[in-house]
UniProtKB/Swiss-Prot annotation:
UniProt key word Amino-acid biosynthesis: yes
Protein name stated in the entry: 2-amino-3,7-dideoxy-D-threo-hept-6-ulosonate synthase
Lineage: superkingdom: Archaea
Biological process per Gene Ontology, one example term: aromatic amino acid family biosynthetic process
Active-site annotation: 33, 153, 184
Length: 272
């Protein structure tokens, strides 16, 4: 895949091909790590049902903690990539922005992971600890041939707008500089400003799905705009697993990301 021409580690390349579409060279990832931060949310109370639905809808990978591997493995049907999330923190913690490492790259390998991910809140009071974790774990990932996804979110006392193009660009570049192969970050809200974010980051960027949107059309238009701005894909959780038609919305996203269809056409995938 052309976007990974700079990666010479054959193990990473083989695993990246499992979570990216080989034809479009894009990806649709469904994060399901919310149970740790927010508890048993509607839509992921049964992770196997959620995993089955997004796999049937065409998603390239699911992302979650260790429990997703044990309780969400489908064991049949269409294969789907597995990304093990290594960071944890809760909404009821005294410092919700602090993320700690709760597993190892080696453990993720034993679980059959195709990639690992870390969460970094850029601007948090403990951000320096998360930077250190990212930098050191990137070295372990390189050793084992494990792709590393860095969730780089501008969050903290000095961050007035988490979608401000300047801070999003800084967060994305920071993740790439510290060794991440793929960056997940906020969409800035318009094509031109996000083009600048993509241009300033040497690693491919996938956009976060963000808060649950009011309409399917609004959400899918954001996906369409992000792809036109140069995004390498989408990593959306609540807008997918809390949808009335999980399979349908997943399929609609995949149509836009992989086939570049218009939003109106993609909406036809949603049956409920």
């Amino acid at each position: 895949m052309k976007m990974f021409d700079n990666i010479k580690n054959v193990g990473k390349l083989i695993r990246l091909e499992r979570i990216f579409d080989k034809k479009s060279e894009k990806t649709v990832i469904i994060p399901m790590d919310h149970g740790v931060s927010s508890g048993p949310l509607e839509g992921i109370k049964d992770m196997r049902i959620a995993t089955n639905a997004v796999a049937d809808g065409g998603a390239n990978a699911v992302l979650g903690h260790k429990g997703l591997v044990r309780h969400g493995h489908r064991g049949y049907g269409r294969d789907i990539g597995l990304i093990v999330h290594m960071s944890a923190g809760t909404s009821i913690s005294p410092d919700p922005n602090k993320k700690v490492i709760v597993t190892t790259v080696e453990d993720a390998l034993r679980m059959g992971a195709d990639a690992v991910s870390l969460h970094v809140n850029v601007g948090a009071e403990t951000d320096f600890e998360m930077y250190r974790d990212l930098g050191l774990i990137s070295e372990t990932c390189e050793y084992w041939g494990m792709p590393l996804i860095a969730m780089m979110y501008p969050r903290g006392p000095k961050i007035k707008d988490e979608r401000d193009p300047e801070v999003v660009a800084h967060a994305a570049r920071l993740g790439a500089e510290l060794g991440a192969d793929i960056i997940k970050t906020n969409y800035t809200g318009d094509i031109d400003s996000f083009k600048d974010v993509v241009k300033g980051c040497p690693a491919p960027i996938v956009i976060a799905g963000g808060p649950k949107t009011n309409t399917d059309e609004e959400f899918l238009q954001m996906v369409k705009d992000a792809m036109h701005a140069g995004s390498a894909g989408v990593a959306s959780g609540r807008n997918v697993f809390q949808h009335k038609d999980v399979r349908g919305i997943t399929s609609a996203i995949c149509k836009i990301v992989h086939e570049d269809v218009e939003v109106k056409e993609a909406l036809n995938e949603i049956k409920i």
